[in-house]
């Protein structure tokens, strides 16, 4: 019995880069696609939002002097590159998918239509959301929160390379304190870097829980959905 039926997974673009630091690492892509295939086979309805940092990092120096709005549009396009790569990886594993973008790209993706996205999920397709919210000044964390609320997801899973939320960066501080559970309010008060404040506020106002967990540990995603206490739960 699944604890969560419909979830949205948020991955950073950097997660796809792996140790390379930029671009798309084929092994990381395959690993994440396999994790999603496993939870899909359990009967979960899965939506996905991916950042674009792995693609955008290569042009970030040039973008530093650009108009913010133009730079943000470049970032949105970077998320679509990752989304197409992920769609291909999933479909090679026999997982049916649909790609929806917040900016019209009719030759390669559907426009985001809420009711259609929900129908795809009900039919067992993994829905990948690209191009963020379609608006500048909003991060892909905020896009993930917004889409999760719109599709009536029961949970956002933020996949990272650490085991959850700590009081400081565990990769820099070996004495960092791990939080198995923490409230939205404490995340905001302690300025913990779970998601950006707009995303956290959206989740808090709509009582949407977040789990932050290590996506690089095989099987974590499936165990979480089956009821194990994995990572950090951010709750009301």
From Swiss-Prot:
EC number from the UniProt entry: 2.7.4.22
Residue sites binding ATP per the record: 10-13, 53, 57, 160, 166, 169
Domain of life, per lineage: Bacteria
Annotated pathway: Pyrimidine metabolism; CTP biosynthesis via de novo pathway; UDP from UMP (UMPK route): step 1/1
Binding site for UMP: 52, 72, 133-140
BP GO annotations: 'de novo' CTP biosynthetic process; UDP biosynthetic process
Compartments it resides in: Cytoplasm
Enzyme type, top EC level: transferase
Cellular component, GO, one term: cytoplasm
Swiss-Prot/TrEMBL keywords: Allosteric enzyme, ATP-binding, Cytoplasm, Kinase, Nucleotide-binding, Pyrimidine biosynthesis, Transferase
Record text on activity regulation: Allosterically activated by GTP. Inhibited by UTP.
Region (Involved in allosteric activation by GTP): 18-23
GO molecular function, one term: ATP binding
Catalytic activity of the protein: UMP + ATP = UDP + ADP
Job description of the protein: Catalyzes the reversible phosphorylation of UMP to UDP.
Quaternary structure and interacting proteins, as annotated: Homohexamer.
HAMAP family according to UniProt: PyrH_B (MF_01220_B)
Family: Belongs to the UMP kinase family.
Protein name (Swiss-Prot/TrEMBL): Uridylate kinase
Species whose genome carries this gene: Chlorobium phaeobacteroides (strain DSM 266 / SMG 266 / 2430)
